Amino acid sequence: MNGKTEETGPFFMHTRTAWGGRTARFLSACALALFLLIMAGLACSALGMTAKASIAMNYLNLSLDLVRDHVVPNLLLTAALLLVLAWLVCLTARFRWLWIALCAAWTVAAIGFVLGGGFTQRGDSCMIIWAAECFASGDYLPMQSEYFQGYSYQLGICFFLELIKRLFPSANLMLLMQCLNALLSAGIIAALTGVAVMLHRREGTEAASMLLFLAFVPFFLYTTYVYGTTPMLLLCACAMLCFTGYTHTRQKRLGLAYAVFLGLAMVLKPNALVPAIALFICAILYMLETGDRRLAAFALLSCVLCAALPAAVNRMYELRSGVPLGNDIALLPRLTMGLQDGETAAGWYNAYTEQFIGSQVTVEAEKAQAMRDLMTRLEEMRCDPGMTLAFFREKCLSQWIEPGYEIVWHGSICSKEGRFNGLANLVFREGETIRMLLDAYLNIFQQALYILILLGGVDTMRRREFRAEHAMIPVILIGGFLYHMLFEAKAQYSYPYVVMMLPLAARGLTMIGAGIRRIRKK
């Protein structure tokens, strides 16, 4: 070929795809290797340590302590839990109707839990609910608050809640959204189970995926949290399902749906940008692998929608209220805060960005101040490598090995005003027997889950499945892990990535189940 090929005709398509396929597989393999490295570190760390979340002295804040755990008992209990889960999958894999019924019962139980507990909200959730109720009644006073002037991206979830309030004007918006969270969570189970089945196609995958969701208690408890997390997760899960479906069928409607779902997810929560970028990368890998440019075009459309839809919502509220929005806090101050010591742990929120909220702060002044503080912090890190290593170690572990992902702490600080609030208090109140048992289970389950995710990745590597759709989950995790190692850390920020990795954990569980079946046949 003398290094030259024509850019038209089947021969060009073949040679370009052959070269592109090798490149795509190599990049996917590299992503999978890095993913395995991260998950191996998290799994080992979770076995030897845990991040204990408790109520701080001022009652509202989170106190987080990294404590050493007992490795041998943890290993034994984790192994026992893995065997029980795998045995259940082997026993019930053929009974699809049973798992559908169990998921329906789980949804009903979640609705009963939020109604019976009557969980109130704290912090950002209160502000968002209040603003949505005001907007639904034509009152735009919240637009004048410093909160929305500095965090205008929260208007996306406000818009969603406002629509719900307008549809059900006489309903309690908080309780209604909690019940809706239960229904949306059932949708997440369905979407990510579909992803697991399409990616792995192994007997028992569907049962394994549903079982892990039902056994993952934080997923159940997050129905009490009125925020953009659960709705965003559903839209991201649907985007992953459509993306995977397109790679199997090349149906254009799936590609379009993938782009739209991600755009809507970005409206609800800006954290959706990480899955959006990850799927964009995977779409490029798919184009290199197959020569199909359409998925890359849909990925580009998703990026446009991720930028345009939140801006459109903000502009709509500006026009409706007549109140112009200020500039959101930029990424540079957020990066600076993420590299500082936080109130809870290294890199967690410390109110550094609050100084930049207000009309008196110009963009230039914000950038200059944040850059000076960032340079000062980087110089401190350069001069003390030991401190730097300890900082990033604490930042990583504090957000990834907190077994409840902050939702148990959130439940403990919320008032319970429902008919069965006594039972809810028994579950969440520190020192209660049920709470101690819950903490112990969450700790063991997190260890088991990380091991299953690691096993799923190892099986993918072993089978040399380096296609773009198999790189999807590893790239999402890598993106989320690296982003929150630099920017603000929170255990609740890690939670969506853990949920999105459950299809890979299902693969790990079916591996163990297959091993059990082979032993039984002997």
Task: Identify the residue ranges that each predicted region occupies.
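Transmembrane-helix motifs of polytopic, lipid-linked glycan transferases
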Residues: 179-200, 238, 452-456
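Loop-to-helix entry region of an early transmembrane alpha helix in multi-pass inner-membrane enzymes
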Residues: 151, 155, 159, 167-187, ...
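Extracytoplasmic catalytic/substrate-binding loops of multi-pass membrane glycan-assembly enzymes
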Residues: 117-133, 137-172, 369-370
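Membrane-proximal stem/loop segments at transmembrane-domain junctions that anchor or position
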Residues: 317-420
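Short acidic/glycine- and proline-prone juxtamembrane loop motifs at membrane-interface regions
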Residues: 218-232
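Membrane-interface anchor segments at the N-terminal boundary of transmembrane helices
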Residues: 60-78, 172, 176, 394-473, ...
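Membrane-interface alpha helices of multi-pass inner-membrane proteins
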Residues: 63-66, 254-270, 279-281, 302, ...
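Transmembrane-helix signature of polytopic, membrane-embedded enzymes
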Residues: 97-99, 192-215, 467-471
